[in-house]
Amino acid sequence: MAQPVPRLSIPAALALGSAALGAAFATGLLLGKRWPPWGSRRQERLLPPEDNPLWQYLLSRSMREHPALRSLRLLTLEQPQGDSMMTCEQAQLLANLARLIKAKKALDLGTFTGYSALALALALPEAGRVVTCEVDAEPPKLGRPMWKQAEVEQKIDLRLQPALQTLDELLAAGEAGTFDIAVVDADKENCTAYYERCLQLLRPGGVLAVLRVLWRGEVLQPQPRNKTVECVRNLNERILRDARVYISLLPLDDGLSLAFKI
């Protein structure tokens, strides 16, 4: 019998397998039915108990995490608010999508410690580029050594300024329609503006991913209790009705929306 795989000790590997992509989708669909996205912090992230046999099986049969990614994830989880980082399942799914569409240019809104930027950079070719946006200069310092360790530091363009400013600069520089994938995990008050600008920057066939679109289940409230919940709900409605994209909303972690530009 296989030994349990602790959530924070997932085997690392570099290879890409089509089964991993399917497992990521299946994991979200299964966990979304069994564990609601509210309550304790673990429940908020749609995670079952670490000793759950089915969860162990899913992790052990799907996760292929680069050593530098694993190291950065473990370091991040030791930091204040470290659990606000994208989960390894989400990172692997987005990296696999980037590989699937042969992405060369990526946007990453909300660098934090650089885990998502690293995952994307590893999925891009040697000449690939990840533009990652962060307003706080401190968290990315944790990730820089791992970017270097993974030999992708040259692919990552860190912009320490408001994400909207970076997006507007890219549009002004004539880069509309040139990006392949965009990941939005930044403040929710500007999420609609991020969505619209990223959509302009993406090429047809590009992928736009928005994280935390269930917001701990508060999107179910009849009346949003704050501006953040209202913004998330408004964005979800906008994406649903947007004829410019094909969509999927997955119950991975606190909700992951995927919009595929037509």
From Swiss-Prot:
Protein location: Membrane
Cross-referenced InterPro entries: Cation-dep_OMT (IPR050362), SAM-dependent_MTases_sf (IPR029063), SAM_O-MeTrfase (IPR002935)
PROSITE patterns, per the entry: SAM_OMT_I
Membrane topology: Single-pass type II membrane protein
UniProt xrefs under SUPFAM superfamilies: S-adenosyl-L-methionine-dependent methyltransferases
Pfam families to which the protein is assigned, alphabetical: Methyltransf_3
Primary site of residence: membrane
Membrane spanning residue stretches: 12-32
Entry's Gene Ontology cellular component terms: membrane; mitochondrion
Keyword list, A-Z: Membrane, Methyltransferase, S-adenosyl-L-methionine, Signal-anchor, Transferase, Transmembrane, Transmembrane helix
EC id: 2.1.1.-
Molecular functions (GO terms): O-methyltransferase activity
Chain positions recorded as S-adenosyl-L-methionine binding sites: 108, 110-111, 116, 134-135, 163, 185, 187, 194
Keyword match Transmembrane: yes
Record GO biological process: methylation
Domain of life: Eukaryota
Family: Belongs to the class I-like SAM-binding methyltransferase superfamily. Cation-dependent O-methyltransferase family.
Assembly behavior: Homodimer.
Function: Putative O-methyltransferase.
Name of protein: Catechol O-methyltransferase domain-containing protein 1
Name of the coding gene: Comtd1
